[in-house]
């Protein structure tokens, strides 16, 4: 499942599922009323979970990369609002950047998706990678930033609060409103 609590409340989740056709047919009415998109991955058990792991890998890395980029930009004198305006129209954008950067600009870290989910989710991704003998250094680096944020007491805040770790380490202030 992908989409978080907001999309869940709107019935706009994305499901990545695998299993028997019979199980899918039984679940279809529920899937249809709670989702915007259902991706089927055949009957091989675990294929949908594998896709979810890939999605979480990208999402977590994108959030950490956004936090790193905006704080780096601030150290270079770039206004955070201008950062969002420009990057959202350039090759460096991502859905996570466009969705999470406003949280930093508005100094609003009320949890839409909390820091605390990322040590779990990226930990699972890295366990899968390890079991597959796959090196995932970007994911490992993102995980360390989320662990640092959780260990600094930010675990219940929105996952955009990982930018506070970058800001602390750089000796800068994020927007305060």
Locate each region found by the language model.
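NAD(P)-dependent dehydrogenase/reductase Rossmann-like domain
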Residues: 43, 151-177
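Small-residue-rich helix-loop
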Residues: 78-90
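Short phosphate-engaging motifs
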Residues: 22-23, 65, 79, 93
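N-terminal glycine-rich phosphate-binding loop for ADP-containing cofactors
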Residues: 10-13, 33-37, 51-76, 81, ...
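Rossmann-fold dinucleotide-binding core
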Residues: 1-56, 60
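Short amphipathic alpha-helical surface patches that mediate protein-protein
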Residues: 32, 88-89, 143-147, 167
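Interdomain hinge/lid region at the active-site interface
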Residues: 45, 49, 93-160
């Amino acid at each position: 499942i992908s989409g978080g609590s907001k999309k869940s409340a709107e019935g706009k989740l994305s499901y990545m599922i695998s299993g028997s056709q019979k199980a899918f047919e039984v679940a279809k009415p529920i899937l249809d009323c709670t989702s915007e998109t259902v991706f089927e991955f055949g009957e091989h058990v675990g294929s949908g979970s594998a896709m979810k792991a890939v999605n979480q890998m990208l999402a977590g890395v994108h959030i950490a990369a956004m936090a790193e980029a905006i704080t780096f930009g601030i150290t270079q004198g770039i206004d955070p609002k201008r950062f969002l305006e420009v990057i959202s129209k350039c090759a460096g954008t991502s859905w996570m950047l466009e969705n999470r950067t406003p949280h930093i600009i508005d100094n609003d870290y009320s949890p839409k998706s909390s820091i605390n989910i990322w040590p779990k989710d990226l930990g699972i991704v890295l366990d899968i990678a390890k079991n597959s003998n796959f090196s995932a250094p970007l994911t490992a680096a993102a995980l360390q930033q989320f662990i640092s944020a959780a260990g600094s007491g930010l675990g219940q805040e929105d996952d955009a609060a990982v930018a506070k770790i970058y800001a602390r380490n750089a000796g800068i202030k994020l927007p305060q409103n």
